[in-house]
From Swiss-Prot:
The gene is pan6. The keyword RNA-binding does not apply. InterPro entries: Cyt_trans-like, Pantoate_ligase, Pantoate_ligase_C, Rossmann-like_a/b/a_fold. It comes from Schizosaccharomyces pombe (strain 972 / ATCC 24843) (Fission yeast). This is Pantoate--beta-alanine ligase. It catalyses: (R)-pantoate + beta-alanine + ATP = (R)-pantothenate + AMP + diphosphate + H(+). HAMAP family: PanC. One of its GO terms (biological process) is pantothenate biosynthetic process. Disulfide bonds: none annotated. Pathway: Cofactor biosynthesis; (R)-pantothenate biosynthesis; (R)-pantothenate from (R)-pantoate and beta-alanine: step 1/1.
Length: 283
């Protein structure tokens, strides 16, 4: 497995692979890898002969400088695990490599509406940072397919729209959430939980499953269900930050005619902001 930091070398290697008739799959990450990331790699290997994984902690998508500073960097461990999975190339650029003139006054990619609603309203500028860096990585790696995790449901929708709007010839593969045995969605931020909070954290998924069942059965009015769910989260020591019920295709708010819905949730537990989602069908 190669580990490269220079975009020109990445471009050359991928070009050589493609000349030999290989398809290229790409998995962008910020490192601190876990089984959720590894599921993306395994899916990528199903779609292409060569797999590229990027490891880059992107300063543009952090609202809090302290959060950026504290984000775990585990490069040696990550590379060892990726090699065991059969990854062909790791792209690990420096900030200076991707943002040679800094990340403030630069050309950016912004997907309107989708980037400022829901999670985007809580984290202004976050998705603009995501789409800007992903578009840069797409240009450098030039993959045939790219894999993204469904845990970041809104992010996947935004990436798909960016790909359509900007005519990237890249297939976006949406990979299901990977959960611990107790139901907690795997996330790098789970490492911020204390041992006691870790025992509480699976309740987020359990409470969302209960809400999904109520919706699926057509029970109750929406405002009441959301209020009851937030109350239940608070009882479990969560601080609810976001709870939205949306059309799973458009992410528009739920209406009487909506059949396929996604419940999007974010809640603080100690220092960790946990996100999760569940899709369901209204009968």
């Amino acid at each position: 497995m190669q580990v490269l930091k220079e975009k020109l070398l990445i471009h050359q290697q991928v070009d050589n692979w493609r000349k030999d008739g290989n398809r290229i799959a790409f998995v962008p990450t910020m490192g601190n890898l876990h089984e959720g990331h590894f599921s993306l790699v395994r899916e990528a290997k199903r779609h292409a002969e060569k797999v590229v994984v990027s490891i880059f902690v992107n300063p543009m998508q952090f609202n809090n400088p302290q959060d950026l500073l504290l984000y775990p960097r585990t490069m040696d461990q990550d590379c060892s695990q990726l090699q065991n999975l059969g990854v062909d190339l790791v792209y690990a650029p420096t900030v200076e490599e991707l943002y040679p003139e800094g990340s403030q006054d630069i050309t950016f990619v912004d997907v309107p509406k989708l980037s400022t609603m829901l999670e985007g309203a809580s984290r202004p500028g976050h998705f603009r940072g995501v789409t800007t860096v992903v578009s840069k990585l797409f240009h450098i790696v030039n993959p045939d397919v790219a894999c993204f995790g469904e845990k970041d449901f809104q992010q996947v929708a935004i990436i798909k729209k960016m790909v359509r709007d900007l005519n990237f010839f890249i297939e976006i593969i949406q990979v299901p959430i990977v959960r611990a045995d107790d139901g907690l969605a795997l996330s790098s931020r789970n490492g911020y939980l204390t041992s006691e909070e870790r025992k509480i954290a699976p309740n987020l998924y359990k409470i969302l499953k209960k809400l999904a069942q109520e919706l699926s059965n057509g029970n109750g009015d929406l405002e009441k269900l959301i209020a009851e769910t937030n109350t239940e989260l608070s009882r479990c020591r969560f601080i609810p930050d976001q709870l939205e019920i949306c059309d799973s295709t458009t992410l528009e708010p739920f209406t009487a005619g909506t059949k396929n819905v996604v419940i999007l949730a974010a809640a603080w537990l100690g220092k960790a902001r946990l996100i999760d989602n569940i899709q369901t069908t209204i009968n």
